[in-house]
Amino acid sequence: MGLNYEYCMPVTILGIESSCDETSAAVLIDGQIVANYIANQSIHEQYGGVVPELASRAHQANIVPVVDFALKTAGISLQQIDAVAFTQGPGLLGSLMVGAGYAKGIALALNIPLITVHHMQAHILAHFIEDPKPDFPFLCLTVSGGHTQIVRVDSHLEMEIIGKTNDDAAGEAFDKCAKMLGLPYPGGPLIDKTAANGNPNAFTFAEPKIPGLDFSFSGFKTSVLYFLQDRLKQ
């Protein structure tokens, strides 16, 4: 079923995201964000990382109030939605299933289109929500907790990964190094904030020698571990 553009009526889309440890819902009217609400999961802090089973259970508890709040903020009812979009992956399977199931239920109940969204493509296409919009073709560096990629973007749906991490993602390396330092989860933002006022030349760590456009962060993570072990001996 296609979207109804008859009489150039505004198109209202409900977006649902549940790929990891945040439950999010947004409402877009004619491409403009009119509501965006995110529920975090603090339960993972005590474990120093995301526990998939706990994440999916938290999504189940959060999905209804998060969507309701987004609709209320937008000043519309569920019946005014023209289509519903959801993250189909990549991500944590249990978490993805919660968002997918809820989105499919809405689409079936209202007989409206269901739009599947690729998580990493969405990171790139988010640049088109606000102005100025990029011109094709362009290169995009995507850096997150689970992915680090260089992507050639030829159109909205034509993308080619030309460089990627061979092991850990940059965000994952940040969080694991933060855990070594005894920082609470998620520690990556804390390291980033602290480093902003630090001395970048105070210590030297091994730099990966990877051919081409790929990345590697596991060696850096190991270098930090050995550095901390040596410092503790002193």
Per-range role (PLM):
Residues P10-V11, S18-S19, N36, D135, ...:
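A short helix-loop
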Residues P10, V117-F138:
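Conserved phosphate-binding catalytic cores of ATP/NTP-utilizing and phosphoryl-transfer enzymes
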Residues T87, V98, L114-Q121, C140-V143, ...:
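Active-site nucleophile and cofactor-binding loops and adjacent substrate-binding regions
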Residues P10-P90, H119, H123:
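N-terminal beta-alpha supersecondary unit
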Residues F86-L110, I129:
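Short Gly/Thr/Asp-enriched flexible loops that form oxyanion-binding sites at enzyme active sites
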Residues M1-C8:
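N-terminal amphipathic/basic-hydrophobic helices that include classical n-h-c signal peptides
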Residues Q80, Y102-H119:
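Nucleotide and nucleotide-moiety/phosphate-recognizing core
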